[in-house]
Curated annotation (Swiss-Prot):
EC number of this enzyme: 5.4.99.25
Domain PUA: 250-325
Active-site residues, as the UniProt record annotates them: D82 (nucleophile)
Gene name for this UniProt entry: truB
SMART domains noted in UniProt: DKCLD, PUA
GO molecular function: RNA binding; tRNA pseudouridine(55) synthase activity
PANTHER family in the record: CENTROMERE/MICROTUBULE BINDING PROTEIN CBF5, H_ACA RIBONUCLEOPROTEIN COMPLEX SUBUNIT DKC1
Name assigned to this protein: Probable tRNA pseudouridine synthase B
Length: 340
């Protein structure tokens, strides 16, 4: 039967308007390391792998393998996948490890195979499943590692792809922390026949998708070997995304060169340091602080709205929580001002 077209929109897909605060702000090309110009060793230190996790190992095991393969000290993944589940698993490396926090508000997408325990007409299946869009209440499954408290989660969209007998293949976009196994169980209850999850694959984690950046562990081993043994870095470089990829979806504040070193040395972002910003920022929002070369400086909590940042001349605009840029990429311009 024909299916209605579903608008598959996650929070990561929101388009934002850029507001100019200082139209005269410029950046010095001699300072910093834009993502596309980082040497390969630096690219690794500030990189994220869009990994196609195979079914079988745990997410923790996969990260441990990557650390061993690439001889790394630190790495972290952006959202656990159960051992049997395959698909998109962003793995942040070394100094970019903490950037996975930025993926929490971005939303995730899965393709799941649901098996019904009884016969149900196709139109009823589609109708009932659409009723699960919006806010739902879940309790984590028994096998979950987290406490089994009731929690509210958002289902952004459900799209039925195929129905064959009692098997239903569907795509679903959800808030981070949503349990698809529990969702399927409750769909089965609503249909009056019961249901369980047969297969599950994650197809998106915010800005990370099933696209040309998605690589397997086998690819990673091969590309690393080409670089280390043959000196061919092209494939290995493409296998690792800059950490800036992980904040594509966040509201951003771009800062002047003169403010960069202050932030990297622990200062919160003050209004005079802002060159431009995204519209729609609300107090409390997680925002990415960027240079005018689109380098990630830090993540922080907005202390003002976009309009306040635009109109005010002083005050703290962003409470800086995590700094990613090294302190020596931009000069301490405030020291020059102090000496002059």
């Amino acid at each position: 039967m024909a299916r209605d077209e579903v608008r598959r929109i996650l929070p990561a897909d929101i388009k934002r308007e850029v507001l100019i605060k200082d139209e005269n702000a410029e950046t010095n090309p001699d300072w910093g390391f834009p993502p596309e110009k980082r040497p390969i060793e630096m690219h690794i230190q500030f990189g994220v792998i869009n990994l196609d996790k195979p079914p079988g190992p745990t997410s923790h095991e996969v990260v441990a393998w990557i650390k061993k393969i690439l001889n790394l000290e630190k790495a972290g993944h952006g959202g656990t996948l159960d051992p049997k589940v395959s698909g998109v698993l962003p793995v942040a490396l070394e100094k970019a490890t903490r950037v996975v926090q930025a993926l929490l508000p971005a939303g995730k997408e899965y393709v799941a195979l649901m098996h019904l325990h009884g016969d149900v007409p196709e139109d009823k299946i589609i109708q009932v499943m659409k009723e699960f869009e919006g806010e739902i209440i879940q309790r984590p499954p028994l096998r979950s590692a987290v406490k089994r408290r009731l929690r509210t989660r958002k289902v952004y969209y459900i799209e039925v792809l195929e129905i064959e007998g009692r098997d239903v293949l569907f795509r679903v976009g959800v808030e981070a922390g949503t349990y698809i196994r529990s969702l399927i169980h409750h769909i089965g209850l609503a249909l009056g026949v019961g249901a369980h999850m047969s297969e599950l694959r994650r197809t998106r984690s915010g800005p990370f998708k099933e696209d040309e950046t998605l690589i397997t562990l086998h690819d990673l081993v091969d590309y690393y070997y080409f670089w280390k043994e043959d000196g061919i870095e092209e494939y290995f470089r493409k296998a690792i995304q800059p950490m800036e990829k992980a904040v594509e979806h966040l509201p951003k504040v771009w800062i002047k060169d003169s403010a960069v070193a202050a932030v990297t040395h622990g200062a919160d972002l003050a209004v005079p340091g802002i060159a431009k910003l995204h519209a729609g920022i609300k107090r409390g929002d997680l925002v990415a602080i960027m240079t005018l070369k689109d380098e990630l400086v830090a993540l922080g909590k907005a202390m003002m709205t976009s309009q306040e940042m635009l109109e005010k001349t002083k005050g703290i605009a962003v409470d800086v929580e995590k700094v990613f840029m090294p302190r020596d990429w931009y000069p301490k311009l405030w020291e020059k001002r102090d000496r002059s």
